[in-house]
Amino acid sequence: SQSMLSFILNGISILALIFLMSSLLSYGSVSRKLNTANEQRFSLTYNANRFMNGSAYLTNEVRAFASTGQQEHYDNYWNEVDNLKNRDKGVEAMQKIGITAKEQAMIDQMSDLSNTLVPLEDEAMKNVQAGNMQAALDYVYGSDYNSSITQINAIKEQFLSDLDARTLAKVETLERNARAIEG
């Protein structure tokens, strides 16, 4: 009877040890997934802002060039377009991490609207170089330009809100899973 009691206690101890090891492995897995989800959330937000800030930078530089005629702003504009390419790099990084079809559609919408600004920006720069400062200002401060900027900003806000909600939900789910394993 004592050997039976030892056998039962040993069995219970082994089962408890197996359960403990399983819990530790599960917690480790969830913890790694949680760290990855947090890193991805940060990277997605960073690169979304990189994309949007690149676009805003181009607007600021073309407007500064139209206002002042200073070559520095013209050079900054084309350096962003030709070399830095923050918009493209931001989108590439987000796609590599993983975005939804809806998020990609919003990026495409913002890009399409941004591309409608290019002819206006081009005309503004040509007018500055020809000495027609008022015409240049009319291109980059006119209703067509401002309408596109307003639309881009509205999509941008929705995009950031959707991205934040999606990535936060993933993080919160993993946090709940971690607490369930701990608890």
Locations of regions flagged by a protein language model:
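Amphipathic alpha-helical segments and their boundaries
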Residues: S6-Y57, G98-L113, N177-I181
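N-terminal sensory and localization modules of signal-transduction and trafficking proteins
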Residues: S31-R32, Q151, A169
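Short, hydrophobic/aromatic alpha-helical segments in well-folded domains
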Residues: N60-E61, K170
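Juxtamembrane extramembrane loops of integral membrane proteins
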Residues: R63-F65
